[in-house]
């Protein structure tokens, strides 16, 4: 309906949890393609940081370019090696442009699963795929 109102070509982005719910615009196929680095090379290049695992939530503020993601845990890296220290849970935040411009490495391997969901508020959840390549980037954790 919104494509017709805007005079544009429909993209199929309107989805809803069930026929009883309102349709909302949803994103499509957003993930990072594979790069040229192995995970081992990426870890070895880190002076100090964390490798984050099992991301499970995220949201963006399209007006102000903010982003926030959560993950189950992170493994500490010092001098290119895992230390054995784990932090949990992990909350990452920042600005989309800062995050994207800080990406310095992208893994060769790409994993996409169908286990994600796209939520609109607290009542609208639609299954989506998620995943992609691993990224080396700078984010604020806390």
PLM regions: where:
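N-terminal small-residue-enriched
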Residues: 1-142
